[in-house]
Amino acid sequence: MSEMTPREIVHELDRHIIGQADAKRAVAVALRNRWRRMQLGEEMRHEVTPKNILMIGPTGVGKTEIARRLAKLANAPFIKVEATKFTEVGYVGKEVDSIIRDLTDVAIKLVRETEMEKMKYRAEEAAEERILDALLPNPRNTWGEEEKADNSNTRQIFRKKLREGQLDDKEIELELSASPMGVEIMTPPGMEEMANQLQGLFQNLGQNQKKKRKIKVKEAMKALIEEEAARLVNPEELKQKAIAAVENNGIVFLDEIDKICKRGESSGPDVSREGVQRDLLPLVEGCTVNTKHGMVKTDHILFVASGAFQVARPSDLIPELQGRLPIRVELTALTTDDFERILTEPNASLTDQYKALMATEGVNIEFTKDGIRRLAEAAWQVNERTENIGARRLHTVMERLMEDISFDASEKSGETFVIDTDYVNAHLGKLIEDEDLSRFIL
């Protein structure tokens, strides 16, 4: 679980996302409150529930990017789901309970990696001994039985060589665990849980089987470390820790929640809209979900919902769900200045990406300040005239601008291209000015 302060979280998000200070502050405080709650006494900890967030803003302003970056910072079970993929229980489609099942699977993977990392030193020692046994087998008598031999000095010499990497390419024969059976089970939509249980059953069938393989020492070391670490980890303890991590630190990011709002003119059962909201309600307010790893309580899972709300409004959500999303954050539409900053300031910005890609062919790209400004203006103008898709427009504009250079790069090794206002106007001018062209091409 992350122990970063809200200021540190915002600073980290600033490295990748331009603007949207309110949204960054809201998610930073929510993430820090997870840590604060864990410092409380048992009784008070049970009473403190997370304050779920609703992020409202046009497409392409950073809602989903905040979720992606938050997942890396959280160091906790995190899952991002599209609200449009679900339908009401009893109809064809995914049920909302699968969100918690998937979140638990994420937690199992996260905890297993952490536990195996703790056991790495012991696993390395055990793997080393098994490789030395394969390199220096005990002699056999006339009846084929192994005899103990005093080869401690030779073993130490080989151990030294093994650690120095001198034996990496030597081939040895080892008994390794057989790979689990890869069985793909097709089930009707909405029956994913049955498929998971059947897959688990087939995987368990070949779990304890061993298989002799000829393998190089370097690859054997990696395989044996994983095998030994997995053997040292207690599966029951792992499940308990994973479920505790989900219940106390789990975060669910619900994207496109505006697409499940009921539209005024529709009538009859709305199974993929209002029906989904009704099914989401128990999860958000707290219930118990049955997963293959055990029962999971959702009372303290943090839900962050986001939507563009261009057609619907937040008030179109059912009142009970509105009440469960108390923190509202509005993200603002991007300006020309924002586009200019997006092109240059974030880590691995778009301009840096294109420079690095072309450098692989020996082509040098230089973006001037006025060229970047003109690019930002071009993206903003097209957004204003056609559909406003936010920062995603920059990808389209940049790809169109770099099309000729990208195509000829392999023949232009050693050359330098300067992207200035004139270059941008020459390659994008007509497209920007002609509304019909920009509507279909940009």
Swiss-Prot record:
UniProt source species: Aeromonas salmonicida (strain A449)
GO CC annotations on file: HslUV protease complex
Protein name: ATP-dependent protease ATPase subunit HslU
A GO molecular-function annotation: peptidase activity
UniProt xrefs under Pfam families: AAA (PF00004), AAA_2 (PF07724)
Family (UniProt): Belongs to the ClpX chaperone family. HslU subfamily.
Entry-linked SUPFAM superfamilies: P-loop containing nucleoside triphosphate hydrolases
Predominant location category: cytoplasm
Quaternary assembly: A double ring-shaped homohexamer of HslV is capped on each side by a ring-shaped HslU homohexamer. The assembly of the HslU/HslV complex is dependent on binding of ATP.
UniProt binding sites for ATP: 18, 60-65, 255, 320, 392
Superkingdom, natural source: Bacteria
Keywords recorded for this protein, A-Z: ATP-binding, Chaperone, Cytoplasm, Nucleotide-binding
GO biological process, one term: proteolysis involved in protein catabolic process
Compartment annotation: Cytoplasm
InterPro entries: AAA+_ATPase, ATP-dep_Clp_protease_ClpX, ATPase_AAA_core, Clp_ATPase_C, HslU, P-loop_NTPase
PANTHER family (alphabetical): ATP-DEPENDENT CLP PROTEASE ATP-BINDING SUBUNIT CLPX-LIKE, MITOCHONDRIAL-RELATED (PTHR48102), ATP-DEPENDENT PROTEASE ATPASE SUBUNIT HSLU (PTHR48102:SF3)
Its job: ATPase subunit of a proteasome-like degradation complex; this subunit has chaperone activity. The binding of ATP and its subsequent hydrolysis by HslU are essential for unfolding of protein substrates subsequently hydrolyzed by HslV. HslU recognizes the N-terminal part of its protein substrates and unfolds these before they are guided to HslV for hydrolysis.
Underlying gene: hslU
